[in-house]
Amino acid sequence: MNPERLQLKGMLAESKKNFRTLDTEASGLVILIRALLNPYEDIKNLDMDKVFVSVKRLKEITEEMQTLNEKIKKLESEFE
């Protein structure tokens, strides 16, 4: 296998690893946001600062995941 293909394979593996890490973090944030937005809690007692920070991070993660997904598809197409 030539060095360029090995490098491409390494980039693909790294991108997939990063995607899985972000996916795990996003899943954790969804659970956290659901817990913070407890529908049985009085609205005055909700910690909206934590909710805001968590939702903001979730948005950043989803944008990173979309970018990584496009990169992964591009790298996989180069193997064909």
Predicted regions and their residues:
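Generic cytosolic/nucleocytoplasmic N-terminal low-complexity/intrinsically disordered segments
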Residues: M1, L8, S15-K16, K44, ...
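Intrinsically disordered, low-complexity regions of eukaryotic proteins
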Residues: K16, E25-S27, D49, Q66, ...
